[in-house]
UniProtKB/Swiss-Prot annotation:
Source organism of the structure: Arabidopsis thaliana (Mouse-ear cress)
Cross-link (Glycyl lysine isopeptide (Lys-Gly) (interchain with G-Cter in ubiquitin)): 625
Lineage: Eukaryota, Viridiplantae, Streptophyta, Embryophyta, Tracheophyta
Family as reported in the entry's similarity comment: Belongs to the cation transport ATPase (P-type) (TC 3.A.3) family. Type IV subfamily.
CDD domains according to UniProt: P-type_ATPase_APLT_Dnf-like
Protein name: Phospholipid-transporting ATPase 6
Amino acid sequence: MARRRIRSRIRKSHFYTFRCLRPKTLDDQGPHVINGPGYTRIVHCNQPHLHLATKLIRYRSNYVSTTRYNLLTFLPKCLYEQFHRVANFYFLVAAILSVFPLSPFNKWSMIAPLVFVVGLSMGKEALEDWRRFMQDVEVNSRKASVHKGSGDFGRRTWKRIRVGDIVRVEKDEFFPADLLLLSSSYEDGICYVETMNLDGETNLKVKRCLDATLALEKDESFQNFSGTIKCEDPNPNLYTFVGNLECDGQVYPLDPNQILLRDSKLRNTAYVYGVVVFTGHDTKVMQNSTKSPSKRSRIEKRMDYIIYTLFALLLTVSFISSLGFAVMTKLLMAEWWYLRPDKPESLTNPTNPLYAWVVHLITALLLYGYLIPISLYVSIEVVKVLQAHFINQDLQLYDSESGTPAQARTSNLNEELGQVDTILSDKTGTLTCNQMDFLKCSIAGTSYGVRASEVELAAAKQMAMDLEEKGEEVANLSMNKGRTQRYAKLASKTSSDFELETVVTASDEKDQKQNTGVKGFSFEDNRLMNENWLNEPNSDDILMFFRILAVCHTAIPEVDEDTGMCTYEAESPDEVAFLVASREFGFEFTKRTQSSVFIAERFSSSGQPVDREYKILNLLDFTSKRKRMSAIVRDEEGQILLLCKGADSIIFERLSKSGKEYLGATSKHLNVYGEAGLRTLALGYRKLDETEYAAWNSEFHKAKTSVGADRDEMLEKVSDMMEKELILVGATAVEDKLQKGVPQCIDNLAQAGLKIWVLTGDKMETAINIGYACSLLRQGMKQISISLTNVEESSQNSEAAAKESILMQITNASQMIKIEKDPHAAFALIIDGKTLTYALKDDVKYQFLALAVDCASVICCRVSPKQKALVTRLAKEGTGKTTLAIGDGANDVGMIQEADIGVGISGVEGMQAVMASDFSIAQFRFLERLLVVHGHWCYKRIAQMICYFFYKNITFGLTLFYFECFTGFSGQSIYNDSYLLLFNVVLTSLPVISLGVFEQDVPSDVCLQFPALYQQGPKNLFFDWYRILGWMGNGVYASIVIFTLNLGIFHVQSFRSDGQTADMNAMGTAMFTCIIWAVNVQIALTMSHFTWIQHVMIWGSIGAWYVFLALYGMLPVKLSGNIFHMLVEILAPAPIFWLTSLLVIAATTLPYLFHISYQRSVNPLDHHIIQEIKHFRIDVEDERMWKREKSKAREKTKIGFTARVDAKIRQLRGRLQRKHSVLSVMSGTSSNDTPSSNSQ
């Protein structure tokens, strides 16, 4: 009987739950009212047919669709999307008007290009939606075990599952809907759930059923089971659930601990039973499946303005043309009697010029419509898809360890990669690996652990390498006999004044890595290993330290059947590192039951492990507010212990007077660990007597079982009563390793002119240490720390006082930056989440942004996911420049979606960030190549491609206008309709696509060697209005040259030996030939990099024109019309036709050649110089010259290893100068004293 009561009491405890990952269960507004607004859902358990019988409570099916279209909506919705674009809509109107007599063209010459372009885009949409449909079919066809009645379960597809069904889910299966947990294979009704698909977290969550349904542990138990759930309506909040279960005449409150969400997976549990509460699109995961925000690049936005400019040009020339036609009709039409202007229905009736003007305006708008590039949008889409393919296939962006390539999840933002100004980065899992290694510890005032952290090794090694590159500058320093086993260390008495940071050699680093044989454990100190700790003077404290590590946690052990080793599933990587460390120290956590944990302790006299049981009485969960976790346990001797671990500031303030014996030494050790970039926690304990614990546990039980909005507050108060009078044992130091190549990547990005901000949830000390390791911070950099430490939260007007304090600190910091006279001075801004709350207020945020922009580094600590998104929005909207956010966890989704470009890292925290991102990479270091290489290329390609599009269409379209003016604004086209059909779609589209896909101003290795080239993108050198208008002007010039030369050569004179003169068709064909040559030769001159593909597309397009002209002219007259045998019999035999083409090519390209030659000679751009250096490098023997030119092509930066080394060299030079000055004074003094002594 006593055992049953104990078991019942333990079942009512929620010590298995990880509340640190959830907000409050209930709303802060107060108790919820079931059956009130928002809480009207009624679920009949095991009776799904009742929902079908009652129309008022009919719920959605479990069928899920993520497609944008279906068979009925595809055509109207997709057509709307296509004609939402201004250019496409214009050509739609033009195609409709082309069927009327007003059109100067054959209707098919207008309809066919439009159908081709729109059809291609719609085909792309259909393909993408088909892929989504097939994914939906796969998900909806999954099967689950569903109760059929009479205690029998059968397999049923997910789409046929209904609200109220009882479902049995097996281990490693996904939950098919949102379920209420009824029972599980564990006797206490718990189960372990992986929610990676929901929140991106890979750590297991623990769910627990109600005691009332605990007995439903077999299939037969559900034969007569029934109940009613009354709960909240469907909503997207993953972490709240309010409702109750009516069963057997009793009402039981429900909370999120009983809810199993769709798309989460059952882990470490044989099976569970649950009742379906929400199905299909009512489930929380589907309620959260909002579309990612639509993002458009800056180039695309500017392109819209250029299209509007071309429309203005179109309207202008159309207005001029129609006005000219009206004037000609009024003044001269009477003389042109053969046009029969006397007919009442005639458009050329001189008595009605206004009518003639209006009608001709429509004709002119159709005639000059080729000023608008109809194939621009589809060509850009094709180019961007191909660019994204090359990004995906780049082996330099492939992570061989994880087998993960880079992925361009959207192709709309390729060119935006080349215009980034500010990078906002998460820390854990992004800059660091999120792989925790136990490295050092402090126990009883003694520090243990002799191994250096990887961040120290990486920073020191990189500095030594940079110092070697600057050998000429360092050679002037007083160094000892050269390099010893270290890369660079100034030894001896002379060099002691100029001490550099110690740098470990590659061999030392290799040895250190070889010594690391256990994942999560990089500790090395023989004083604690192999039971040597028993010989330490404070062995009792060391024993308690190890036991706290092994017992105070919420982890789950899993035994590897092959190796017999225990692995651990824990709520954080830190806890895994603690358990691995305790195992290596001889205290292995082997088993957890509903009420106990078992530790195999290996320090007995026999040398064999002894299993000890610790009964868990209570667990006080870790939360971000509490910053600590405690376990109340009873050991085998019957002693009740409170074991506590948490942030040092929290633990230290809860120590008893007698528990502060090691406080001073431990604090010093924590500071040292923090400076080494390590994550720290303090450990303490307290012994409890039975009476004290019984009284407290009664209060704790009341708080645990309470139902109301203040439940969490009650738990916090009760917990706070117990977690005091602690005895300090020591502290841990865990290393969150830097990802491979992070320091070098940050250095190169800084030299490319990019600003880097770090937004992290870690404490300030840890973030600062990682900043030093990455060289975002360095010695000598002036840190501006904005905080609210001096503001009293209890004041009546605390918010106003906080904002006033922040504004004062920002103003003082801004003044300090302005009056700083040292040009090399660098400032770093550091702010925590609490202060950031006020700094992001509307009346403060722009002053805060101005200060942040003036600083070389910005580090925001202890920030929430919402604050990350708000900071990103402020940087994006406040500066007006392109921002990139990069992260790896679910808490980074907000800032990834808010930034202009979101980059997700496919790391250990799940795929939530990747799914929300625009680009995904496996490691932070790949960001350098993604931006500096692919970003630079894509920006320049797209910019040149768009400018060329406008050039070729202006060149072509204006020749029609000139011919109109020449022919009295007749509305007649000089070109055959088939020419118009081919111009944009065939004859000029492939070369421009090759430009957008293959163009390289410099190779990839040179992009990385000369990072300052990247600044051409943020400065928008290739798509500013100066360059755009220059290309347009070039198009106007080319059109004038082509028309005037052809008119002068072919008009009213023979062009063949037989005296034949050129008619309009011959002149039009010759002019069109010149256009094809001119625009294709122009694109060839624009390219800096040729492959055989580009040659084929450019010269093949020109050849295709002649082939078409020859073949089309051979068709019967009914088909070929007025170009019958145009090439073979009329133009080809005439030498003047070929000479005209050569003359036009020379005349149209000479200005461009003159411009580019002048620019390269007088005012070259960076890539021009680098191209020449690269070209002539084979004749350069002096490698130092190459390095010197590389250094010139780097942006001046105040962060990164380069800036760090520069600062160190300036520091050393200053010291040397001061020392030389002292020596000079001393030598001068001694020389003055010598004559006087001689005279005496």
